[in-house]
Amino acid sequence: MEVIGTVFSVLGNEMAVRFGRRRWILLVMCISIVCALGLGFVSGISYWATVTACLVYNAFIYADSASLTAGAVGSAEPERKGATMAMHALLGYSGGFVGPLTLGVMLDLMGGETVFSWGIGFAHVAIIMLVGPTALLILKPRDLEGDRGAR
């Protein structure tokens, strides 16, 4: 999964350069939300459907990673690039820590190992993920110089 993630991270940034960073990140975040909404419920179909859904979800989770990092660095004031990267890393790793915990809490609250529990658990993740596109739509960060799709 990490190899797929790394490849999609790099390819995702190339797409951001070609089509516009904000537009690409918004699209990928929305696809990730849709994937999260369905992922837990797919486990009731078959093992291979679940594996495929997990791989697709993983690819889209990573597809905006490099674009977000490049956007953070490219948008930072020159004298604050280090502090910006520190905050970027802190927020990213905090989400990576808190996300699985909240999913686990939701699983426990919903009764554990049922398809419904997993579906609600991942739906909860999707709801939290709405913060990303909402922030992009409200803050409207500029695309970076060199992004061909920039408006």
Regions found by a protein language model. Give the residues of each.
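A membrane-interface helix-boundary motif in multi-pass transporters
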Residues: 105-128
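C-terminal transmembrane helical hairpin of 12-TM major facilitator-type secondary transporters
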Residues: 20-68
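Residue-level signature of mid-helix packing/kink "hotspots" within the transmembrane helices
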Residues: 2-10, 96-97
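Intrinsic disorder in cytosolic terminal tails and internal cytosolic loops
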Residues: 139-151
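A late C-terminal transmembrane helix in Major Facilitator Superfamily
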Residues: 75-111
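Intracellular helix-loop hinge segments at the cytoplasmic ends of transmembrane helices
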Residues: 67-75
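Helix-to-loop junctions at the C-terminal end of transmembrane segments
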Residues: 9-21, 107-108
